[in-house]
């Protein structure tokens, strides 16, 4: 019984520390990453804007639902094993830039993703992704900072693009 109390106390202490650290972390963060691919800006832009095809190349995305547009802006919902997230396309500059925003106020996080494409010559393109994120829940702030890493999803996305375009 004594070990049960010690184990339970240790769990409570770890959770309390995670909450305290989470409260100390800022709500907003910025993370970015980039990779260069053997593909033209046009082919990369087509890949990242054809959201209906995400389940065929993005790891973790099981389905994409196209939703009614808001103020003429495309909206879609990504479905994964962890749930779903609704996005809205804030702006596009064909073959140069895409900006999406999480469009779901019920989530404990939000923010925008900016995809910048730069031709680097010889049919190669650098894709830079910048996340301007917000994590409202202190426990999620702790997890996103110390467990997943702010750039974890960006790294996965870039790796998925690389697998798709070669």
Predicted regions and their residues:
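A short, structured loop/turn motif at beta-sheet edges
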Residues: 38-41, 69-71, 90-96, 116-126, ...
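Short, surface-exposed coil-to-beta transition loops
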Residues: 30-32, 83-87, 109-114
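Generic structural detector for well-ordered beta-strands
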Residues: 34-38, 65, 77, 88, ...
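Hydrophobic pocket/interface hotspot
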Residues: 43-48, 54, 76, 89, ...
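Hydrophobic ligand-binding cavity/cleft-lining segments
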Residues: 2-68
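Short beta-edge strand/loop motif at the mouth of beta-sheet-based domains
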Residues: 52-86, 95-97
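A generic beta-sheet turn/junction motif
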Residues: 37-39, 80-82, 93, 106
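Beta-strand/loop substructures that line and gate deep hydrophobic ligand-binding cavities in soluble
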Residues: 102-156, 161-163
């Amino acid at each position: 019984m004594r070990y049960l109390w010690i184990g339970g106390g240790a769990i409570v202490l770890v959770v309390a520390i995670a909450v305290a650290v989470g409260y100390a972390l800022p709500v907003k963060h910025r993370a970015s990453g980039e990779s260069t691919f053997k593909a033209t800006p046009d082919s990369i832009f087509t890949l990242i804007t054809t959201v209906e095809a995400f389940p065929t190349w993005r790891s973790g995305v099981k389905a994409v639902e196209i939703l009614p547009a808001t103020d003429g802006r495309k909206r879609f919902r990504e479905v994964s094993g962890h749930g779903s997230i609704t996005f809205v396309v804030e702006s596009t500059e064909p073959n140069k830039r895409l900006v999406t925003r999480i469009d779901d106020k019920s989530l404990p996080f939000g923010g925008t993703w900016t995809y910048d494409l730069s031709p680097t010559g010889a049919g190669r393109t650098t894709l830079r992704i910048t996340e301007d994120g917000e994590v409202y829940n202190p426990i999620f702030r702790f997890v996103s900072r110390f467990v997943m890493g702010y750039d974890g999803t960006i790294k996965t996305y870039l790796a998925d693009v690389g697998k798709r375009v070669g």
